[in-house]
């Protein structure tokens, strides 16, 4: 993964984790994601940033999607 893409993915993941107040997001690193998944991560990021709050089931679904996007 290029350094620029890695930095962008890292920022997207960090933004998502802060928005969701996820405590264990530290285990997810940009290196865990393929550059091929960048668009999917960006889409998830945009969706998360648009909402002001999340139900527990939505948070679980987002965490599950992040897990699925890992290499």
Curated annotation (Swiss-Prot):
InterPro entries: UPF0435. Belongs to the UPF0435 family. This is UPF0435 protein BPUM_0734. It comes from Bacillus pumilus (strain SAFR-032).
């Amino acid at each position: 993964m290029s350094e620029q893409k890695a930095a962008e993915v890292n920022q997207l993941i960090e933004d998502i984790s802060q928005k969701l107040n996820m405590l264990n997001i530290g285990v997810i690193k940009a290196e865990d994601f393929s550059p091929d998944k960048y668009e999917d991560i960006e889409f998830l990021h945009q969706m998360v940033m648009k909402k002001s709050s999340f139900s527990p089931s939505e948070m679980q679904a987002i965490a599950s999607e992040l897990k699925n996007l890992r290499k």
